Design a protein with these regions (language model features):
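Accessory/interaction modules and long regulatory regions
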Residues: 1-124
Length: 124
């Protein structure tokens, strides 16, 4: 089984990079990951994301939130939002598309999540 990066490269020669969040977190470089995603989004790169097939320890959480393992999602946009108009606290949100269209994110910040009501300023 290959990766989305390998598929894109095989189809049209698109240069691809792969990043593993677990590796970045171990290095304490979470801000670097956000910078990479922002730059890729701004430059209109094709970005895909997937859940590591070795994430068995998180299998229940994956299913609870409506995600699929062994499956690629497309990054539609990445945004950094303030939780309150005058506050400094931010959240980094990713809008992903499931090409299958059969399952949907059910966790915080999902389409019908109460989180939007808790932080109405973000929706604006």
């Amino acid at each position: 089984m290959g990766t989305a990066a390998e598929a894109l490269n095989n189809i049209d020669g698109t240069p691809c990079k792969e990043f593993y969040v677990a590796d970045i977190e171990r290095q304490g470089e979470q801000a670097m990951l956000w910078d990479i995603l922002q730059e890729a989004d701004e430059d209109r790169y094709v970005c895909t994301m997937s859940i590591d097939s070795n994430a068995r320890s998180n299998e229940d959480t994956i299913k609870e939130f409506g995600l699929c393992d062994f499956h690629s999602y497309t990054l539609m946009q990445s945004v950094s939002v303030k939780l309150h108009p005058n506050g400094k606290k931010r959240r980094y949100l990713l809008q992903l598309r499931n090409p299958w269209g059969k399952k949907e994110w059910l966790g915080p910040w999902s389409d019908y999540s109460k989180t939007w009501e808790t932080y109405p300023y973000v929706h604006e």
